[in-house]
Protein backbone atom coordinates (compact mmCIF):
# COMPACT_ATOMS: atom_id res chain seq x y z
CA UNK A 1 0.00 0.00 0.00
CA UNK A 2 1.38 3.39 -0.94
CA UNK A 3 1.28 6.31 1.45
CA UNK A 4 -0.87 9.10 0.03
CA UNK A 5 0.07 11.84 2.50
CA UNK A 6 3.45 11.38 4.25
CA UNK A 7 3.15 14.65 6.20
CA UNK A 8 -0.14 13.56 7.79
CA UNK A 9 1.53 10.26 8.65
CA UNK A 10 4.39 12.15 10.34
CA UNK A 11 2.03 14.34 12.38
CA UNK A 12 -0.06 11.31 13.37
CA UNK A 13 3.03 9.41 14.53
CA UNK A 14 4.07 12.39 16.70
CA UNK A 15 0.54 12.75 18.13
CA UNK A 16 0.24 9.00 18.86
CA UNK A 17 3.75 8.85 20.33
CA UNK A 18 2.99 11.65 22.76
CA UNK A 19 -0.35 10.18 23.82
CA UNK A 20 1.46 6.87 24.50
CA UNK A 21 4.25 8.73 26.40
CA UNK A 22 6.94 7.44 24.04
CA UNK A 23 10.46 8.88 24.26
CA UNK A 24 10.92 8.97 20.47
CA UNK A 25 9.13 8.07 17.24
CA UNK A 26 10.63 6.83 13.96
CA UNK A 27 9.37 7.28 10.41
CA UNK A 28 10.66 7.27 6.84
CA UNK A 29 12.62 10.46 6.14
CA UNK A 30 12.22 13.13 3.45
CA UNK A 31 13.54 16.67 3.00
CA UNK A 32 10.16 18.18 3.90
CA UNK A 33 9.81 16.07 7.06
CA UNK A 34 13.33 17.05 8.17
CA UNK A 35 12.50 20.73 7.55
CA UNK A 36 9.30 20.43 9.62
CA UNK A 37 11.23 18.68 12.42
CA UNK A 38 13.90 21.43 12.37
CA UNK A 39 11.19 24.10 12.66
CA UNK A 40 9.48 22.24 15.53
CA UNK A 41 12.83 21.96 17.34
CA UNK A 42 13.61 25.67 16.80
CA UNK A 43 10.18 26.60 18.20
CA UNK A 44 10.69 24.30 21.22
CA UNK A 45 8.01 21.68 20.49
CA UNK A 46 10.36 18.67 20.21
CA UNK A 47 13.59 17.87 22.05
CA UNK A 48 15.68 16.69 19.08
CA UNK A 49 15.64 14.87 15.75
CA UNK A 50 18.12 12.79 13.78
CA UNK A 51 18.26 11.15 10.36
CA UNK A 52 19.68 7.62 10.43
CA UNK A 53 20.60 5.32 7.54
CA UNK A 54 21.84 5.90 4.00
CA UNK A 55 19.84 3.67 1.67
CA UNK A 56 16.46 4.07 3.39
CA UNK A 57 16.90 7.02 5.77
CA UNK A 58 14.71 7.13 8.87
CA UNK A 59 13.80 10.26 10.80
CA UNK A 60 13.81 9.82 14.58
CA UNK A 61 12.07 12.56 16.56
CA UNK A 62 12.73 12.78 20.31
CA UNK A 63 9.54 14.04 21.92
CA UNK A 64 9.43 16.70 24.62
CA UNK A 65 7.42 16.65 27.85
CA UNK A 66 6.92 19.23 30.61
CA UNK A 67 5.81 18.02 34.06
CA UNK A 68 4.88 14.63 32.53
CA UNK A 69 2.57 16.28 29.96
CA UNK A 70 3.30 16.53 26.23
CA UNK A 71 4.53 19.94 25.06
CA UNK A 72 2.47 19.61 21.87
CA UNK A 73 -1.18 19.89 22.92
CA UNK A 74 -2.53 19.94 19.39
CA UNK A 75 -1.01 19.17 16.00
CA UNK A 76 -3.32 19.36 13.00
CA UNK A 77 -2.81 19.04 9.23
CA UNK A 78 -4.34 21.93 7.28
CA UNK A 79 -3.32 21.71 3.62
CA UNK A 80 -3.69 18.19 2.25
CA UNK A 81 -3.31 16.59 -1.19
CA UNK A 82 -7.05 16.84 -1.93
CA UNK A 83 -7.43 20.43 -0.72
CA UNK A 84 -4.42 22.74 -0.72
CA UNK A 85 -4.70 25.85 1.49
CA UNK A 86 -2.77 28.99 0.53
CA UNK A 87 -2.79 32.34 2.35
CA UNK A 88 -1.26 35.75 1.70
CA UNK A 89 0.98 37.25 4.38
CA UNK A 90 -1.76 39.52 5.73
CA UNK A 91 -4.21 36.59 5.96
CA UNK A 92 -1.91 34.12 7.76
CA UNK A 93 -3.76 32.60 10.74
CA UNK A 94 -2.81 33.14 14.36
CA UNK A 95 -2.94 29.80 16.20
CA UNK A 96 -4.40 29.94 19.74
CA UNK A 97 -4.04 33.72 19.84
CA UNK A 98 -0.32 33.56 19.08
CA UNK A 99 0.53 30.77 21.56
CA UNK A 100 0.87 28.19 18.77
CA UNK A 101 2.40 28.28 15.31
CA UNK A 102 1.28 27.62 11.78
CA UNK A 103 3.94 25.91 9.65
CA UNK A 104 4.01 27.75 6.31
CA UNK A 105 5.75 26.63 3.12
CA UNK A 106 6.96 29.81 1.39
CA UNK A 107 9.20 30.56 -1.57
CA UNK A 108 12.04 30.98 0.97
CA UNK A 109 11.43 27.57 2.60
CA UNK A 110 9.46 26.43 5.63
CA UNK A 111 8.89 28.95 8.41
CA UNK A 112 6.47 29.78 11.19
CA UNK A 113 3.56 32.13 10.62
CA UNK A 114 5.30 34.86 12.65
CA UNK A 115 8.48 34.65 10.55
CA UNK A 116 6.46 34.62 7.32
CA UNK A 117 4.49 37.71 8.40
CA UNK A 118 7.73 39.48 9.34
CA UNK A 119 9.28 38.61 5.96
CA UNK A 120 6.11 39.65 4.13
CA UNK A 121 5.61 36.19 2.61
CA UNK A 122 2.54 34.03 2.16
CA UNK A 123 2.34 30.40 1.18
CA UNK A 124 0.84 26.99 1.80
CA UNK A 125 -0.31 26.32 5.37
CA UNK A 126 1.11 22.87 6.18
CA UNK A 127 -0.13 22.41 9.76
CA UNK A 128 -1.03 24.03 13.07
CA UNK A 129 0.96 23.23 16.22
CA UNK A 130 0.00 24.36 19.72
Curated annotation (Swiss-Prot):
Which PROSITE patterns does this UniProt record tie to the protein? RIBOSOMAL_S8 (PS00053)
InterPro entries from the xrefs?
Answer: Ribosomal_uS8, Ribosomal_uS8_CS, Ribosomal_uS8_sf
Q: Output one GO MF annotation.
A: rRNA binding
Q: Which residues cross the membrane?
A: none
Q: Name one GO cellular component term.
A: ribonucleoprotein complex
Q: Name the source's superkingdom.
A: Bacteria
Alphabetized, the UniProt keywords read:
Ribonucleoprotein, Ribosomal protein, RNA-binding, rRNA-binding
What SUPFAM superfamilies does this protein map onto? Ribosomal protein S8 (SSF56047)
Task: Name one process (GO BP) from the record.
Answer: translation
Q: Which family does it belong to?
A: Belongs to the universal ribosomal protein uS8 family.
State the protein's purpose: One of the primary rRNA binding proteins, it binds directly to 16S rRNA central domain where it helps coordinate assembly of the platform of the 30S subunit.
Q: How does it assemble?
A: Part of the 30S ribosomal subunit. Contacts proteins S5 and S12.
Q: What is this protein called?
A: Small ribosomal subunit protein uS8
Annotated gene: rpsH
Amino acid sequence: MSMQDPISDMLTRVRNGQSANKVAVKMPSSKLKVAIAALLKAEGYIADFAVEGDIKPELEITLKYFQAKPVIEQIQRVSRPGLRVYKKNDALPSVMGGLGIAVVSTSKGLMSDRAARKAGLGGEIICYVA
